[in-house]
Amino acid sequence: MASNGKSNAVSVCPGPIKRREFLRIGLSGFATLSLPGLFELRARAATEKPKARTAVILVWLRGGASHLETYDPKPDAPSEFRGVFSPISTCVPGMQISELLPRHAKIADKFTLLRSMAHTGGGHPAGSLQMLTGDPDPQDKDKPIFPDWMTVANFLRADPKRPLPNYVGVNPVTRYDNFTIAGPAYVGPSYGPFTVNGDPNDPHFSVPNIGYKDQAQSERLSDRIRLKQSLDRLDRAIDQSGTMRAIDDFEAQALSLLTSPGAREAFDLSREPDHIRDLYGRNQWGQQCLLARRLVEAGVEIITTTFDGPLCGRVANWDDHAVNHNVFDALKFRAPYFDQAVSALIEDIYARGLDKRVLVVVTGEFGRTPRIERVASSGGGVASAAAGTVQPGRDHWPRAFSNLWAGGGIKTGGVIGATDKHGEEVVSRMCTPGDFLATIYRHLGIDAGQITIPDFSGRPNLILPRGAPIPELERQS
């Protein structure tokens, strides 16, 4: 197992790094970091290095989507389980999905469904931490104690010589209410996401601090950086730890973000033709996915995008309890946006020849209870009916749920695993969060069972102590 045997002397990050903070840190240096083994660790990380630099786009359904109303319908179950929507056939013989997803159905040959995910985290924080960090603890926590896979991959694969950050969160996966559901933990905040907030469909949307449009500004900044580098020359000459080398790299990337026209262009959706923007949908989720595609084309390797907010309905996420709103009304409202955005992303990835390099994963922290709950509305906050109105809902269900995999060179047009006739329990090919994460790491060329990263005390920790890549999702030669 590879380890540099030393820790990063940094504090735990409470959330993603803001754009200004990212650039400020990059330009002021990382004097507090202890990084002598970083470059050796990165060199050892990719024991099965892909032929091309691979990428992952994670579409996160915050709150947990119902598997029965998306990828694992149960038309033969009793009415108290099956819900009001019917299944439809897809272009893949024998594969059915919810009628809410007709666009998915037309491109089912381009994705694989995993219907047998299960874990023990019944709360939003615990479920999210299990899926994103591999933490097996079923109890909720305020913040992660293990780094999420995105931060780890960024730590191991970051190349500061490129003009763009390697990990971008487009409406990032970081929080659920007051809980931090993803973060760098002991890897250190400098490897968190470059965050892009706001609605990319807004005509006034822009990403601040990316690429000066004024060439004179760029030249003045470059002059200042060159002056700073000349003053630092003596320190670099006597440095033996590798720390100054790391500072050079972080400074180079921060400068590149500010001065590179290519960096600015990658985030500029106005450069897309109208028919492509229409393909994804002229709404927040559609344009988030389009931005994700632009970023992987530009070389970004780790992208997360969260589907929540107004397009989910009044609850603003996928947490479809009856006390919040009528689950079926909510799903009927949000499904067209979800269906179009995800299907367009998959189609576009294949149309552009990115399907071998880019893996798309769609999931939430868990599924929803197969047995429909009928509970009186709370009548307040995000509730969709007057207080006392009895309405249907589905609660948290981590014991069996589904996710979607597309691209990544995997064999598509299939289904992995199965749940019972009610969708309550996994009956074949159970997969755990460790398996889920190991599969993502494998696509990124990272041997998760061998690489260690030191924690705050300097003790080496396997980046994934349990789990194995899912064989059915292995890249095809």
What residue spans do the PLM features occupy?
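Ligand-binding pockets and gating/stacking loops
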Residues: M1-S477
